[in-house]
Amino acid sequence: MNDVVKIVEDFIRPHIPQPFELFAVEWEKFGGDMMLSILVDKEGGIEIDETAELSEIISPLLDTISPDPFPTEGYLLEVASPGAERPLRKAEHFAGAVGEYIFVKLYQKINNEKEITGDLVSFDGETLVVDVLDKTRHKNIEIPLSAVAKAQTMVKF
């Protein structure tokens, strides 16, 4: 985990008011600038006006982090919802996504597949069980969390 991400995550997590929760912090290059994305959510989803209110809370807090982890040339701040197709990075993200349609990219092939899409049937903290459609029948594929390179929820059409 990037130092800026860890510092920001640890610093702002206790300041996120209920019923909201800190979903993820991202620190990435955006054009010629660096962007700090604070992804927040709540049961039932978050509204755009709520992200604006949270931005008003979070922005001044970031200015009080000492020592300052941000580059002297500044950064862009985005406070947003993780969205309908949200990233799954931590064990608690997978636990919260049980029953949802997901996309998983693997470090190495499992069942001759490096990318798997299906319904997340269960997650025990270490292994995902994904129900995939193989031609005309369903089958469950077990995926160790350590084998997951990238994952996200998907909108099923």
From Swiss-Prot:
Gene Ontology annotations of biological process type: ribosomal small subunit assembly; translation
Keywords: Cytoplasm, Ribosome biogenesis
Pfam families listed in its UniProt record: DUF150_C (PF17384), RimP_N (PF02576)
InterPro entries: Ribosome_maturation_RimP (IPR003728), RimP_C (IPR028998), RimP_C_sf (IPR036847), RimP_N (IPR028989), RimP_N_sf (IPR035956)
One GO location term (cellular component): cytosol
Subcellular location: Cytoplasm
Main location group: cytoplasm
Family per similarity comment: Belongs to the RimP family.
Functional note: Required for maturation of 30S ribosomal subunits.
Official protein name in the record: Ribosome maturation factor RimP
Gene: rimP
